[in-house]
Design a protein with these regions (language model features):
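Short loop/turn elements at secondary-structure junctions
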Residues: 56-126
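Conserved short "hinge" loops at termini or chain/domain junctions
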Residues: 1-60, 104-126
Length: 126
């Protein structure tokens, strides 16, 4: 799993902090970073990791960033969900965005497979 996002990519703002806010203590910054890593891991696990540059493409990065920040914010606001291993219900919007990214991922994977595999021609003698 590769991490692509930092807490300044929208997570701080979604939790009510400014990106340039220096009043955050290291504990909260670490909690945000850990939550973001967990969110990215969840999202990538739900979608796939075979396609290089899928999550950083111009088309997909905004949705990927949005869903990861929403999930990470939920983790920060409900820390028991991470530490106790309790099941966290992913809301309908998060599920919908993950579903949309899954569709894009499947299409891109299909397109890439079509380019990577040469079509086999039948022998005219057959």
């Amino acid at each position: 799993m590769t991490t692509y996002l930092k807490i300044t990519d929208g997570l701080k703002r979604s939790l009510g902090y400014l990106d340039e806010d220096d009043s955050l203590d290291d504990g909260l910054k670490n909690k945000m970073s850990s939550a973001l890593i967990a969110a990215e891991s969840y999202v990538q696990g739900a979608i796939g990791t075979e396609l290089k540059d899928f999550y950083t493409s111009e088309e997909n990065k905004p949705l990927y960033t949005l869903v990861c920040n929403a999930l990470a914010a939920a983790y920060v606001q409900n820390p028991v969900s991470i530490t106790s291993g309790a099941v966290v219900n992913v809301d309908i919007v998060t599920n919908a965005i993950i579903g949309q990214l899954r569709g894009r991922y499947a299409k891109e994977l299909e397109d890439q497979d079509g380019k990577d595999i040469e079509s086999e021609q039948t022998d005219p003698k057959d």
